Amino acid sequence: MKQKCVLIITDGIGYNKNSKFNAFEAAKKPSYEKLFKEVPNSLLKTSGLAVGLPEGQMGNSEVGHMCIGSGRIIYQNLVRINKAIENKELEKNENLQKLLAKCKRVHIIGLYSDGGVHSMDTHFKAMLEICAKNGNEVFAHAITDGRDVSPKSGLNFIKDLKGFCENLGVHFATLCGRFYAMDRDKRWDRVKEYYECLLGKAYKVPNLLEYLQKSYDENVTDEFIKAAQNENYKGMREEDGIIFINFRNDRMKQLVEVLNSKDFKEFEREKIFENLLTMSVYDDKFKLPVLFEKEKIENTLAQVISKAGLSQLHTAETEKYAHVTFFFNGGKEELLENETRVLIPSPKVKTYDEKPQMSAFEVCDAVKKGIEKGEDFIVVNFANGDMVGHTGDFNAAIKAVEAVDTCLGEIIECAKKHDYAFIITSDHGNCEAMQDEKGNLLTNHTTFDVFVFVQAKGVSKIKDNMGLSNIAASVLKILDLEIPKEMNEALF
């Protein structure tokens, strides 16, 4: 069976039997049509317990890529934190106790929704409660979502938070959309707006809930809410404690850097803060205490390939580069021996409905070059289905799928020419459900299964009831390498 192999991850493209508001179904996609007819295919589970999340919880790119790259189900921080809250372990956490003892005033910052991709509203509330019951003066800084949940769901979430804060005697201090507070693309002007807000230098309002409603009236939805502060909030002091409740790292790193790094040069800062505590490890370069340390994941797909002396290429555009490197490699940043990484810059547009093809064709070229060079294994992510799906623009999402389809056709042709096997799948769905039955926009991921196609010597059928954790062993089987005991079985 031994063959070189390309693993193609078509981010945000899932299977929805309902063709209404389904951008995948509506797209012209000759490459996919050919795959369905000619290549062994099946469906994989990408949500809930199949990827280490709570039952019914939609999957996401971080979890999906970790599952694919490690070849096993890793119980995600979301599940670990839920358990720690239930069994009261969180309030006993040593790093949390140290911060609460040291700092009288404590600020809780995070995305406030039940999306479960970056954070969870229940975690935010649990932290407010622990800090308030400890006798600290507590400030809530809510970041509105509108991306992993519907665009105007923030009103109910913020109403809930405001009432919760009032009952606890906690200050509801600031409000800001994730577009500003959670940028990950080095748009420092956005982060600066939020930094100024935390310092008490933003637009002041008597009621943050009314401010949110007013933003809706002006057609500004949750993701894009401009930073505002309660008129009684006077800003953070340098001796205050700051707790970040997002468990996913990629969209909190820049904010932590702005608040804490002594070497930060992107804009002038009035204050730097030392007493920070993060929910998980945001970046190894931050020497900060964390609530939930990383679980060590050994014998990942990339490690096994590297140890065997084979070469591998990991490529994607900016938006998904961390997913095919850091997350795919089991939460490790370091480059492995014989591993090459190619980062293709994402287009500089405000939202990707402005350019639905994104940088797919450049990513496609990088893959073809890798095949022509003879890389033993290539993993690539096409971001379009997900990133354009998040905009809620149905027509743009159709164009996104069509761009991916064109790229698939080119890669498949190149793979066949050079006798490569290929596996095509997605980390989760998104663009296959762009509106609900009432016509409300759906910008979030779905819980639908995703397609998997395997073209390799000797493969004629894929087993039933498989998930993302069965892909790594499949790649190793194609490469004729030993499958480590930590991995789940192959798809065939």
UniProtKB/Swiss-Prot annotation:
Q: Does the keyword Isomerase apply?
A: yes
Active site location: S61
Question: Domain of life of the organism in this record?
Answer: Bacteria
Q: Which UniProt keywords apply?
A: Glycolysis, Isomerase, Manganese, Metal-binding
Name any cofactors this protein relies on.
Mn(2+)
Pfam families under this entry?
iPGM_N, Metalloenzyme
Please list the residues that bind substrate: H118, R147, D148, R178, R184, R248, N249, D250, R251, K320
User: Could you cite one Gene Ontology molecular function of this protein?
Assistant: phosphoglycerate mutase activity
Q: Which residues bind Mn(2+) 1?
A: D386, H390, H445
Q: What is its EC number?
A: 5.4.2.12
* Residues involved in Mn(2+) 2 binding: D11, S61, D427, H428
How does the cofactor bind to this protein, according to its record?
Binds 2 manganese ions per subunit.
What HAMAP family does the record point to? GpmI
Q: Which PANTHER family match?
A: 2,3-BISPHOSPHOGLYCERATE-INDEPENDENT PHOSPHOGLYCERATE MUTASE (PTHR31637:SF0)
Q: According to its UniProt record, which protein family does this protein belong to?
A: Belongs to the BPG-independent phosphoglycerate mutase family.
The subunit field of the Swiss-Prot or TrEMBL record says:
Monomer.
According to UniProt, the name of this protein is 2,3-bisphosphoglycerate-independent phosphoglycerate mutase
Q: Which species is the source of this protein?
A: Campylobacter jejuni (strain RM1221)
